[in-house]
Structures are given as C-alpha cells and as structure tokens.
C-alpha cells in the first residue's frame, strides 16, 4: 500500500515554536549584554561603563550567603501571601477552595512564568488550572486579572511615593501625605471601573449570557472591602519583593537608603512584565544595572544583584514545578450550567 505523506505541522504550532525560539534568543542576548556588555548606557563622558570581570567574580565568590538565603525565604513567603490575595479575590466568584489550594496554583503559575514570555506568562495557566469549563476559566481569568491589577496598583503607589519623596527631599510627614494621596487615587480608579461594570450589567439584555457572566463578577462592586483587602495584601507582596532585593544586595555588600530600593525595584518589576524574554531574565539584570548605576552602584554589582535575585525567583518557580508534577489534574469547580458527561 502507498504510504500517505506526513501531514504538515499546523501553522499555529509552528508559529508558537518560532515565538518561543525568538524569546529564547532575546533572553540569551539580554543576559549576554548584561554580563559581557555590562548593561545599558555603556558610555558616558567618553569613559566606557560595564562589568569588570575580576570584581564581578570577586563579588559572587565573597557573597555572604546567609543573607541570600534570607532573601530566598522572603521570596517564598511573598508568593504565599500572593496566593492568599488571589484566594480573597477568587472565592467571591465561586471558587470556594482553601488558601493552600490557591497558594499551590500560584506557585505553579510561577513555574510556567519561567518558561513563558514575561513575568506574567503563568497567569493563563493559573486560570486554566482552577476552571473546568470555558465560562469558569473566563471567571478565573477575571480573578487573575483583578489580582494582577491590585498588585500593580500597590506597586504604582510605592514607586510614585518613593520617586516623589526622593526627588523633592520630603520629610516623613510629607511622604506619608503623598502615599495617602496616591493610594486614594488608586482606589478611586478601582471604584470608577467597578461602577462602569455595574452600568454594563444593567445595560445588557435580561437572560443574555454576557449579562449572566458580568453578574458573576459583581461581588467586587457589591463588596468594596474585597478590593481594599487585596490592595492591602499587595503592599505586603510588593514590600516582600523589595526586601528580598535588599537582602540580596546586602549579601553582596551593597547598601542603599530604603527610598532607593522602593523606587528601583518596582520599576524593574514593571519592566519584567514586557513579553520579550522568558521569565523576565535579561530584562531584570539590565534594568537593575542601569537604575542602580544612577545611585553610584558599580555595573558589576547591579548585574550580580539581578542574577542572584533571578536565582531566588527561579527556585521559587521550581517549587511550583514540583507541585505541578505531583498533581497533574486541576481541582476545578464543576460548572452547573453544563451537562455532566455520560
């Protein structure tokens, strides 16, 4: 019998592999640029700036590793708190699981973020893992989006406060005033968005699928304390991230005022959201080197801090990978609107 020709690889799958290959190339290129090239903005006043290999190796070889272990512990604790924050936002939408369930899924999302573009690549996996149907996965996606937005709100308030206070040399009272003002502005933005959601629900036809879906998200509007609680947890998560970087820097003998770290680390976290590298690697190291150089930190120290911070993130993600391998099936909520399989 004649052998049937092999079917060509689906174009979408090929595009996915090409996209992954491109991101791997970009990640390797950015890491090489950070280590070999020495980061961004290589030259100023005719003098080259970059990593001095002898000092770079000396920094890493003489690192005070107990401080780095403390940074790893803070990183893991921050992800646990982030999982609890997600639980607070997902339960009102019908995902009635204990905190440990969401913490586990959050770590799994961290693992996939190591393999997917940017630092938010695992968000899609988190939504899929807790929903058993298309509608429930959309709802889960709403909870993940709300979780991400509350985190960005806290991050924006912190970096805005730090930058304004540092650039204007504000005292403690004035800094607290700036923080309160930015926090109120952020919460007001959430209130406006939820009010728009409420109006959209009222405008949709009775009995429509879209109206029923929006109704599932209305608890955020009906219980404003949910957003307040999530934003509060977000400040804990963001401060844990800053503390982890401070501890990594301390391990390398780099000490800066708190306002420096509060302004630099959130900006680096925002840069890592860009979908140009795997897990934010390369972006993290270049951004830290560039920003810290403005505060007198040598290039090799900035890159080394980024590398050791990245290792903390990598190990936290690998914890999620182990959890994923131990349990492959999602513990998802059955959708009552869909008939059970025979």
Where are each of the predicted segments found?
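Predominantly cytoplasmic-facing regulatory/coupling regions of multi-pass membrane proteins
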Residues: 1-107, 164-273, 299-307, 311-342
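Transmembrane helix boundary and interhelical junction motifs in multipass membrane proteins
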Residues: 80-85, 117-127, 259, 273-288
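Extended non-transmembrane interhelical loops and adjacent amphipathic helices
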Residues: 88-91, 103-132
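Transmembrane helix-loop junction
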Residues: 91, 114, 132, 250-251, ...
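Membrane-interface alpha-helices at helix entry/exit sites of multi-pass transporters
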Residues: 99-104, 118, 122-123, 133-149, ...
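Mid-bilayer segments of alpha-helical transmembrane spans in multi-pass integral membrane proteins
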Residues: 110-120, 148-157, 187
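Transmembrane alpha-helix termini and helix-breaking/packing motifs in multi-pass membrane transporters
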Residues: 156-168, 294
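Hydrophobic alpha-helical transmembrane segments in multi-pass integral membrane proteins
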Residues: 276-279, 286-310
């Amino acid at each position: 019998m004649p052998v049937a020709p092999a079917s060509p690889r689906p174009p979408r799958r090929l595009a996915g592999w090409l996209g992954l290959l491109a991101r791997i190339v970009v990640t390797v290129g950015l890491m090489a640029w950070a280590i070999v090239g020495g980061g961004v903005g290589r030259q100023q006043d005719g003098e080259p700036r970059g990593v001095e290999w002898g000092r770079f190796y000396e920094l890493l070889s003489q690192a005070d590793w107990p401080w780095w272990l403390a940074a790893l512990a803070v990183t893991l604790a921050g992800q646990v708190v982030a999982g609890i924050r997600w639980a607070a936002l997902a339960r009102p939408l019908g995902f009635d699981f204990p905190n440990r369930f969401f913490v586990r899924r959050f770590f799994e999302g961290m693992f996939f973020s190591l393999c997917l573009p940017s630092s938010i690549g695992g968000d899609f996996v988190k939504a899929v893992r807790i929903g058993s149907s298309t509608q429930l996965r959309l709802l889960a996606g709403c909870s993940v989006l709300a979780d991400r937005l509350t985190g960005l709100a806290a991050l924006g308030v912190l970096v805005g406060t730090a930058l304004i206070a540092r650039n204007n040399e504000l005292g403690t009272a004035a800094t607290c005033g700036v923080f309160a003002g930015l926090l109120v502005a952020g919460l007001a933005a959430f209130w406006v968005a939820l009010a728009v959601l409420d109006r959209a629900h009222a405008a949709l036809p009775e009995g429509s699928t879209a109206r029923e879906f929006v109704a599932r998200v209305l608890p955020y509007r009906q219980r404003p304390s949910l957003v307040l609680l999530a934003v509060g947890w977000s400040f804990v998560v963001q401060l844990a991230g800053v503390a982890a970087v401070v501890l990594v820097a301390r391990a390398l003998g780099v000490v800066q005022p708190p306002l420096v770290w509060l302004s630099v680390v959130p900006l680096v976290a925002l840069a890592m959201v860009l979908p140009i590298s795997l897990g934010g690697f390369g972006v993290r190291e270049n951004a830290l080197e560039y920003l810290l150089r403005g505060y007198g930190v040598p290039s090799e120290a900035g890159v080394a801090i980024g590398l050791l911070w990245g290792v903390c993130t990598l190990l936290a993600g690998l914890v999620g990978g182990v959890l994923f391998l131990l349990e492959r099936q999602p513990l998802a909520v059955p959708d009552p609107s869909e008939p059970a399989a025979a």
